[in-house]
């Protein structure tokens, strides 16, 4: 019996309109009633997630910023990692061959010099907003991650540039087709979930996890049961062919799977039924 369930948010637990559906909320409450520990593992900011969970009437442990912050159910900081100050300074002062917008996550919010109100659509539930600022004026310490937003091909080319200049000093992953993230070396959802599991006297074998993007890869591959969304990035499905594919986020595929698992765990699951 698994004791902890970890959920990615965008493309997994959230529907396309960025809400948690009713069937999904019911399934989450059933997990809690069955003694399961809920964990929400996301690239979103802690402040964003607290707003979403408060609005939805659900609570759980939080792995935010793609593993850069781990908090308990009361918001107490359990673990965290920041980018080295010299890397942040290097990224901000280097004239990269790209038109990608740059976004920086810190404990006190989301900072960018790119004013695009369309980016706020995904944060209506929480009312979380970016803060317009000159990025070179931000402190170089205390930065969790740097995000680059642009069409995928442009980001793929930028990723090559970044890796050539920084080598193994940082990690890079696509949290969506149009979002490339720069994270502290060794920082990912899987590593953060392992640290949280240890804090809870569990192992990753005691956990199940759900995800759809490359920032979920380490988490899905290391837990006792990893579930890949039907709408997952093709690269994720290709790199984790051994994992079961369930329904799509817009169909509340997580809820569909959990209802089956809670009622008939001994039967083979199919997302079509």
Curated annotation (Swiss-Prot):
Active-site residues, as the UniProt record annotates them: 8
SUPFAM superfamilies: HAD-like
Keyword Metal-binding set for record: yes
Keyword flag Magnesium: yes
Cofactors required: Mg(2+)
A Pfam match: Hydrolase_3
GO molecular function terms attached to this record: 4-amino-5-hydroxymethyl-2-methylpyrimidine diphosphatase activity; magnesium ion binding; phosphatase activity
Entry keywords, A to Z: Hydrolase, Magnesium, Metal-binding
Record: residues binding Mg(2+): 8, 10, 212
UniProt EC number: 3.6.1.-
Class of the enzyme per the UniProt entry, highest EC level: hydrolase
Catalytic activity annotation: 4-amino-2-methyl-5-(diphosphooxymethyl)pyrimidine + H2O = 4-amino-2-methyl-5-(phosphooxymethyl)pyrimidine + phosphate + H(+)
PROSITE patterns listed in its UniProt record: COF_1, COF_2
NCBIfam families on file: Cof-subfamily (TIGR00099), HAD-SF-IIB (TIGR01484), PRK15126.1 (NF011705)
Physiological role: Catalyzes the hydrolysis of 4-amino-2-methyl-5-hydroxymethylpyrimidine pyrophosphate (HMP-PP) to 4-amino-2-methyl-5-hydroxymethylpyrimidine phosphate (HMP-P).
Similarity comment: family membership: Belongs to the HAD-like hydrolase superfamily. Cof family.
Name of the protein in question: HMP-PP phosphatase
Native source species: Yersinia enterocolitica serotype O:8 / biotype 1B (strain NCTC 13174 / 8081)
Gene this chain is encoded by: cof
């Amino acid at each position: 019996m698994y004791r902890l369930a970890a959920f990615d948010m965008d493309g997994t637990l959230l529907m396309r309109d960025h809400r948690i559906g009713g069937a999904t909320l019911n399934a989450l409450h059933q997990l809690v009633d069955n003694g399961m520990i809920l964990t929400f593992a996301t690239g979103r900011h802690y402040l964003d997630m607290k707003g979403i969970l408060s609005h939805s009437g659900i609570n759980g442990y939080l792995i935010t910023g793609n593993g850069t912050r781990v908090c308990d159910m009361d918001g107490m900081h359990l673990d965290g990692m920041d980018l080295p100050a010299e890397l942040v300074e290097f990224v901000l002062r280097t004239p990269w061959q790209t038109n990608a917008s740059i976004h920086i996550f810190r404990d006190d919010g989301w900072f960018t010099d790119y004013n695009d109100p369309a980016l706020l659509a995904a944060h209506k539930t929480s009312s979380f907003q970016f803060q317009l600022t000159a990025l070179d004026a931000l402190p170089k310490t205390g930065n969790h991650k740097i995000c680059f937003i642009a069409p995928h091909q442009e980001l793929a080319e930028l990723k090559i540039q970044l890796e050539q200049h920084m080598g193994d000093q940082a990690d890079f992953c696509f949290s969506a087709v149009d979002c490339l993230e720069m994270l502290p070396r060794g920082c990912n959802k899987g590593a953060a979930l392992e640290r949280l599991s240890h804090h809870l006297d569990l192992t990753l074998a005691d956990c199940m996890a759900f995800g759809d993007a490359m920032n979920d890869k380490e988490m899905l591959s290391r837990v006792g049961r990893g579930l890949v969304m039907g709408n997952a990035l093709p690269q994720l499905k290709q790199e984790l062919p051994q994992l079961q594919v369930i329904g799509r986020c817009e169909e509340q595929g997580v809820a569909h799977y959990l209802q089956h698992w809670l009622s008939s765990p001994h039967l083979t699951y199919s997302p079509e039924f």
